[in-house]
Curated annotation (Swiss-Prot):
HAMAP family: Val_tRNA_synth_type2
Stored Gene3D superfamilies: 3.30.720.200, HUPs, Isoleucyl-tRNA Synthetase, Domain 1, Valyl/Leucyl/Isoleucyl-tRNA synthetase, editing domain
Domain notes: ValRS has two distinct active sites: one for aminoacylation and one for editing. The misactivated threonine is translocated from the active site to the editing site.
GO cellular component, one term: cytosol
A Pfam family it matches: tRNA-synt_1
Name listed for the protein in its UniProt record: Valine--tRNA ligase
Keyword Ligase attributed: yes
Family: Belongs to the class-I aminoacyl-tRNA synthetase family. ValS type 2 subfamily.
Localization annotation: Cytoplasm
Residues given in the record as ATP binding sites: 537
Length: 888
């Protein structure tokens, strides 16, 4: 029996343990069953899940549960992305271990990461996540690193991997290069400096505007727009840089924005991506003025050794003294920062460095073509990837100057020769292992000490989960697994990593297999705080899952995620979770009520012919099943979730169950059996529809109400409800809707008179013309539901008479004005009630004389109460469509 109260903290852990112990979600390769492989996002092992993880991974879980119910063999692994700067920073800060002790440092990174994995896995389980944990993977596992290194060797063999000096995004705080996807612009307050640069021929100045005066020592040109009339006369001339006494050319290029600042900018190597484009486009020299640690170098002359911020201030002061800085304007502008990890957020420099690159810029058209073969949900998310591909200025820098990461598996000779490892030795770590052979000239190759960008690790996840790495070795089981599951069915992920995880996965998978990685990609938005702003500690609006679940349970939180629209940001609202919790309480109470009535019910005894309201609710149910299936196939959970809640709370609980209670408690055994049959079919299917969304409460309901009859070990091993056209009954639906409206009007009458819903009504008559036959069909349902002693359904229109039953002055307004005349005014109103009412209706006032004195009263001065009478009895009325309800 279901306990009296719904307690998610009691039932949820119980069923989570049951699912794990019974291996309910274990995947077994079965070539006879259709496969549905999910390329799940491996979260970075920070040690805790945030609400963004809860949203995205609950979506994934909803899909996995639904697909199992529709007959698919669901491959649902979960991985963890282990490598990354935050772990290194934590080990340095919390454990005091330096990267100068690489082996000890690595060991501590691994130890800490295992602790983080354990904590995050437990959080996944606590939200009801139905992954097969036997398939869990970690990017720091040796077999995983071996697969990554094998993929890298394949790229090298295809001529797509190279080492070169090139401007890269450099984090002075982390002392490492970054991929474009790891950096981003942040809106900040700053200054725009207006500087006059003297023309070398002495004929005047070119005014430029810049936010970074400290880059002047690295200036190699000044650019203006070719159509800008202000500067046409200086194009081709040179300006002389103040302080540094160098001459640089003035060039024209259409990329210049004439409306920004003065319309003239200087090109420094390198202030931003545009500087890189111009330097390469015009083959300009490269001058570097900033060190790796963010200080100025010897090219900065007298400013060498200063931090960039200090040099900016000092150069601006010196230019002002020279009369060349003529304006300093406060602005709101975008600053490039290390945005991928909030623990850093340092300003980014563009520095030329020798790094390892994967060729990608030349393949963007192919990447877009492959992406077009994938079904994007929502479709406009494809455009984000396309725009990103078209905006790429250079290749993918994959090397990182870190310790904890997948090693780049190469040794390099002085002559440029690259020594590859023996593939049977993978994974290798050149930092600690000797090369497999010497250079061709007999010299010792030098190890590559860099590690890989973590996106190199995670961009082969669809290959990892389908055992590509085993299949290419000729492993028979691996080949079967790969052939059956690749391309995977689905990639679910967030909008924020379209340009990284989605882009690089499509690219790498296409290069390695010639195929798309997935058939579908589902994009979720970001989670905003309760105030609608991005969740941030600085805003004080961060809500952790561990704050929500103890109070409301995982199922209520899961419903909040299901209400998120695809591709759009979704604010966390406490009131939404509270509403969801109350909905689940309502569900609990529905099934507790039904449990008593269905205890000895045998579904095999269900009669074929049901009563009208039974046919109505089952018709509505099957319309919902059809809609639910369509929405689930399109991954549109938000609309479906709203429909489910509305249907269960209102049509099932408020209407249908209330309208069959009299039958369940009554003496008509045949009618009672029909009600039980409909209730059983209804609640069984509602449970199945809810199961992917709220797996814990539905498991509890199944085990208590249905398992003995059905036999399956878990609700999540049952089939998704099948839509039946035979159950659609349009006439019954019209009838049911009319019953809802009639009963609703009667409930409102009871409520307005302070009557309980089960209070008896002595006499009610319903007059109707068009709905007479329908109402006669449900006459006993209306009478039984509303406890009406005498209910009449009468064809035709009622004869109603409106009478004034009370008319008197409003003593508060009339008394002060007319004093002793009030009694006579009262008498006049009663004697002339109809005339007074007519005058008030037409003009809003009435004038008459009392004892020779003129009296003028408005609507506010008169209390007028009318009543409706039918056959001499006072009645109250309500109108529903063409039906008029009379309450005697």
């Amino acid at each position: 029996m279901l306990p009296k109260n719904y307690d998610p903290n009691e039932i949820e852990p119980k069923w989570q343990k049951f699912w794990l112990d019974e291996k309910i979600y274990k995947y077994e390769l079965d070539e006879k069953k259709p496969s549905y492989a999910i390329d799940t996002p491996p979260p970075f092992t920070s040690g805790t899940l945030h609400l963004g993880h809860v949203l995205s991974h609950t979506w994934i879980d909803i899909i996995a549960r639904y697909k199992r119910m529709t007959g698919y063999n669901v491959l649902f692994p979960q991985g963890f992305d282990n490598h990354g700067l935050p772990t290194e920073l934590k080990v340095e800060k919390e454990f005091g271990i330096s990267k100068d002790q690489p082996e000890k440092f690595l060991q501590k990174c691994i130890e800490w990461t295992w602790q983080a994995i354990e904590a995050m896995r437990n959080q996944f389980i606590r939200i009801g996540y139905s992954a097969d944990w036997d398939l869990e993977y970690h990017t720091m596992d040796d077999w995983y690193k071996a697969a990554v290194q094998k993929s890298l060797i394949e790229f090298y063999k295809k001529g797509m991997l190279y080492q070169a000096e090139h401007p890269v995004y450099w984090c002075p705080r982390c002392r490492t290069s970054l991929a474009k996807a790891e950096v981003g612009y942040v809106e900040e307050d700053g200054f725009l400096y207006y500087i006059k640069l003297p023309l070398a021929d002495g004929s005047g100045h070119v005014p430029i505007a810049t936010t970074r005066p400290e880059l002047m020592p690295a200036c190699v040109a000044v650019f203006v727009h070719p159509e800008d009339e202000r500067y046409k006369h200086v194009v081709g001339k040179k300006v002389k840089l103040p302080i540094f006494e160098r001459e640089v050319p003035v060039l024209a290029d259409e990329d210049v924005d004439p409306s920004f600042g003065t319309g003239a900018v200087y090109n420094c190597t390198y202030g931003d991506e545009q500087d890189v484009v111009w330097q390469k486009r015009y083959n300009l020299p490269v001058i570097i003025a900033i060190n790796e640690d963010g200080t100025m170098n010897e090219n900065a002359g007298p400013y060498a050794g200063l931090k960039t911020e200090e040099a900016r201030k000092k150069i601006a002061e010196d230019l002002e003294k020279m009369g060349l800085l003529y304006k300093k304007e406060k602005i709101r502008h975008r600053v490039l920062r290390h945005t991928e990890r909030s623990s850093c957020m340092a300003p980014i420099e563009l520095l030329p460095k020798k790094q390892w690159f994967i060729k990608v810029k030349d393949f963007t058209d192919e990447i877009v073509k492959v992406a077009e073969q994938i079904n994007w949900y929502p479709p406009d998310m494809f455009l984000r990837l396309k725009d990103w591909a078209e905006s790429m200025d250079w290749d993918w820098v994959i090397s990182r100057q870190r310790v904890f990461g997948t090693p780049i598996p190469f040794w390099v000779c002085d002559n440029g020769e690259i020594i590859l490892p023996n593939e049977e030795d993978l994974p290798v770590d050149p930092r600690f292992e000797k090369p497999p052979r010497k250079c061709s000239d007999g010299s010792e190759p030098k190890p590559v000490t860099d590690v890989l960008d973590c996106w190199v690790d995670s961009s082969i996840t669809p290959l990892i989960i389908t055992k590509w790495h085993e299949a290419i070795k000729g492993d028979e089981e691996g080949k079967k697994w790969f052939e059956h599951n690749f391309p995977t069915a689905l990639r679910p992920q967030g909008t924020d990593i379209i340009r990284t995880w989605a882009f690089y996965t499509i690219f790498r998978t296409w290069v390695l297999t010639g195929e798309k990685p997935w058939h579908d990609i589902l994009i979720n938005g970001m989670v905003a705080g309760p105030d609608g702003r991005k969740m941030s500690k600085s805003y004080g609006n961060v809500v952790a899952p561990d704050e929500v679940i103890p109070k409301y349970g995982a199922d209520a939180l899961r419903l909040w995620t299901a209400l998120a629209p695809p591709g759009e940001d979704h604010p966390f609202k406490w009131e939404t979770v509270d509403y969801n919790y109350r909905f689940l309480q309502k569900v609990w109470n529905i099934y507790r009520f039904a449990e008593r009535h269905l205890e000895n019910f045998d579904p095999a005894s269900a009669p074929e012919e049901l009563e009208p309201l039974d046919r109505w609710i089952l018709s509505r149910l099957h319309r919902l099943i059809k809609f639910a299936t369509e929405e689930m196939e399109k991954y549109r959970f938000n609309l479906l979730t709203r429909e489910l809640i509305t249907f269960v709370w209102h049509e099932v609980a408020d209407d249908y169950i209330e309208m069959i209670k009299y039958r369940l408690y009554g003496d008509d055994e045949e009618s009672k059996l029909k009600a039980k049959a409909a209730l059983y079919e209804l609640l069984y299917n509602v449970m199945l529809l809810l199961a992917p969304f709220v797996p814990h409460i539905t498991e509890e309901l199944y085990q208590n109400l249905f398992r003995e009859r059905i036999g399956a070990k878990s609700v999540h091993l049952l089939e998704w409800p099948k839509y039946s056209e035979a159950r659609i009954d349009e006439e019954a639906e019209k009838l049911g809707e009319l019953a809802r409206e009639i009963v609703g009007a009667m409930r409102r009458y009871k409520n307005s008179h302070g009557l309980s819903l089960n209070a008896k009504l002595k006499h009610v008559a319903i007059y109707t013309t068009d709905s007479y036959e329908v109402l006669k069909t449900i006459e006993k349902d209306i009478a039984g539901t509303m406890n009406i002693e005498k209910l009449e359904i009468i064809k035709g229109e009622p004869e109603l008479e409106e009478r004034i039953i009370e008319i008197k002055p409003n003593f508060k307004t009339v008394g002060p004005r007319y004093g002793k005349l009030v009694p006579k005014i009262t008498a006049y109103l009663k004697e002339n009630a109809e005339e007074v009412a007519k005058a008030l209706k037409e003009s809003g006032k009435i004038e008459f004389e009392v004892d020779g004195q003129k009296v003028e009263l408005t609507k506010d001065d008169i209390v007028l109460r009318k009543a409706v009478f039918s056959e001499g009895e006072e009645v109250e009325t309500a109108v529903v469509g063409d039906a008029v309800i009379l309450f005697f």
